[in-house]
């Protein structure tokens, strides 16, 4: 987990905001809250861009990242490996070309981000951490 996501998780814990230990579907209430928070911060980001104040822009970018990381915390998703996989996928776009509208067209060598295995690993690691100790670990813990 990145330092940034860890800080947001700390905030969630201090303010009794939902924290999931592993990837978990969110309730409708949580979904609505996260969408509203992201939209609010995105709107504030657009306003700061229109104003041209770099300090305000930097603050609003941080606020948007904060609520996006908060969404990851609420869903129990460690974003570090997810971001790395998306980065790997994005770099596989080398060899494509940019259209007139600025969109990058993917080359045949493009490889889409494969997120499912990452979430499965996160769920498995969480389940492993929750298993009761046995054998040597249990004896050492009792010592």
Explain the meaning of each model-derived region.
Residues 1-61, 65-143:
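Flexible "arm" and connector segments at domain edges
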């Amino acid at each position: 987990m990145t330092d940034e996501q860890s800080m947001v998780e700390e905030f969630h814990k201090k303010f009794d905001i939902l924290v999931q230990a592993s990837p978990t579907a969110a309730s409708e209430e949580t979904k609505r809250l996260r969408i509203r928070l992201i939209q609010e911060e995105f709107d504030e980001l657009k306003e700061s861009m229109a104003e041209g104040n770099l300090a305000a822009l930097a603050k609003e970018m941080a606020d948007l990242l904060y609520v996006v990381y908060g969404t990851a915390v609420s869903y129990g998703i460690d974003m570090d490996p997810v971001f790395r996989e998306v980065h790997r996928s994005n770099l596989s776009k080398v060899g494509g070309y940019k259209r007139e509208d600025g969109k990058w067209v993917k080359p045949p060598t493009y490889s889409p981000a494969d997120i499912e295995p990452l979430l499965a690993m996160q769920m498995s690691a969480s389940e492993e951490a929750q298993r009761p100790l046995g054998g040597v670990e249990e004896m050492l813990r009792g010592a």
